[in-house]
C-alpha cells in the first residue's frame, strides 16, 4: 500500500521493500534480520528501531490450495507486479530514479478510483479467495468502484468465500 498511498498524495504508514537481491544476500547485508518467508523471498530487516519487510521480486507457479503457490521463482519487477492482486497494489517506487514503476495500470486506476484485478480476475480469486474480500474492503475504504470484470468474477466466485479461514479474514 506504500506506493498506492504515495500516488494518492498520502504519507505511507509503512514501507515494504522489493528487490532483486536474494534472501541470503539481504541477510548478509544487514546484521539484524529474520526470515518470515524465505522460501517466498521475504526477510524482515531490523534497522535503527524500524522493521522493514524486504521481498525478492518473484513469480508464482499455480496455486494449489487457494492460498499458496506450488513454487516460486525469483524474477523481475514486471513479473512480480503481474502476480499481484489489484492494479492499485502492483506498482513499485524507484527511490534512486524518483519514479513509479507501473506496468499494470495502477496509476490510471487510482486516478479513476477503480479496483481492478491484474490479469484474469477469476484466476486471481481462485489463487487466493481472500482477494475477493480485499477488493470489497479497498472499494469501501478508498471510496472506489470495483471494475466490472473484477466484480463479475467476484460474484461468480462468491460461494467459495466460506473456504477462507476465520484467522485469515482477521489478518
PLM region spans:
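Catalytic cores of the polymerase beta-like nucleotidyltransferase superfamily
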Residues: 2-171
